[in-house]
Amino acid sequence: TILFIDPGFPVQKQQLVVMGQKFETFDVYDFRGDKLKEKLESYLKKGNISAIVYSNPNNPSWICLKEEELRIIGELATQYDVIVLEDLAYFAMDFRQDLSKPFQAPYQPSVAHYTDNYVLLISGSKAFSYAGQRIGVSCISNKLYHRSYPGLTKRYGGGTFGTVFIHRVLYALSSGTSHSAQ
C-alpha cells in the first residue's frame, strides 16, 4: 500500500488504480508540524505501507513542507523501512527564498537529508520551461539503489532496487525518452 500526503498530483493515484495497487491518503493541511508525526505513525504502525508519496511544493495549493516536517518523514521512513518518493516537480520554485543559485545556499529542502530511503522525482520539463513532451530525473540514494528486496526478485527475477527500477520498470514504461526532449 502506498501512502499519499495530499494535496498532490492526482495522476499518481490513477496510475496505482491502473496497476491494481492499493493506496491510502490524508490531507496534510490539518497535520502540520509536530502533528504530522502522529498522523504518519497511525498509518505506518499497521505495517502495510511500502512507500510515502508527496509533492513539495505541491500543486494546486502550493503547500511547502518545512524542514522539521521533512525530518519527521525521513526519520519515520527509516524507522518503519518505507521508501519516500519525493515529487519535486516544482524544484526550487518556492520563491519565498532565492533557490536559484546552483551550489550555493539556500538549497531545495528535501527528505534526502534525513533518510537513505528516498527517490527524488524532478521535472526537467518544468525546470527548463519546456512545454509539451515530458522529461524528468529520478535520483535514488546509493543505499537504496544497491538494496535487494525479495519481492522485486520474485517479480522481476533479481537485481537491486536501482537496477530493477532502471532496466525493468522505467525502461518498460517509457521505452527511453523522445529525441526532442533530450
Predicted ranges, named:
Residues 1-13:
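Conserved PLP-anchoring active-site segment centered on the Schiff-base-forming lysine
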Residues 4, 25, 85-86:
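Hydrophobic residues in well-ordered beta-strands that form the structural core
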Residues 9-10, 57-60, 90-92, 96, ...:
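Short, solvent-exposed loop/turn segments at secondary-structure junctions
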Residues 21, 79-82, 116:
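A short helix->loop->beta-strand "cap" motif at the edges of active sites that frequently abuts
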Residues 30-99:
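Active-site phosphate-binding strand-loop segment of PLP-dependent enzymes
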Residues 114-182:
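Conserved core segment of the aminotransferase class I/II
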